[in-house]
Each structure stands twice: as C-alpha cells, then as structure tokens.
Regions:
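A compositional/biophysical signature of low hydrophobicity enriched in polar/charged and small residues
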Residues: 1-81
Length: 81
C-alpha cells in the first residue's frame, strides 16, 4: 500500500524538513519520493508499506519526529474502478 504524506513545516524549514524526510530509514515503510510543493503544504512524501499499522508507525515515529515538521496529513492511495 502507498500513502501520500502532506507535510507542513515551520517557517523557513521546508528544505531541512524535505532533506530529513528523504533520509529516513524505517523497517516499516519505504520513502519513495519527497517533493517540495506550492500551496497549503510545503512537502509531499510518498511512502510504501505492506501493512497499514506499519505505515502509520513510520509516519508517527519517523516523519513527525523530523525537526521542523508542524503537521502531517496522510492520504492513502486507493484503486479506482
């Protein structure tokens, strides 16, 4: 399963947050991509895991612990049709 994690960073911290998220290693999930974006979020990361609980753990124990992360919103990828 995959999820997009929309990340809001502290002012002036988007670059550091993006770099920090990109360097995360977790036995629970793999970071596939990290991109800076415009709009209400600063960074969007794509994660992949074989288990929903492990994915959640990677977000709470990994991404949310990166210095400068203020808030995350997780969007699970679903198949249409």
């Amino acid at each position: 399963m995959r999820a997009y994690v929309l990340i809001e960073s502290a002012v002036g911290q988007a670059n550091a947050v993006g770099n920090g998220v990109g360097k995360l290693t977790s036995p629970n999930a793999r970071v596939i991509s990290v991109n800076a974006v415009t709009g209400p979020f600063d960074i969007i990361a794509l994660l992949e895991s074989n288990d929903l609980d492990k994915l959640g753990q990677a977000i709470t124990d990994g991404i949310q612990q990166v210095e400068g992360v203020q808030r995350t919103t997780t969007c699970l990828v679903v198949k249409l049709g």
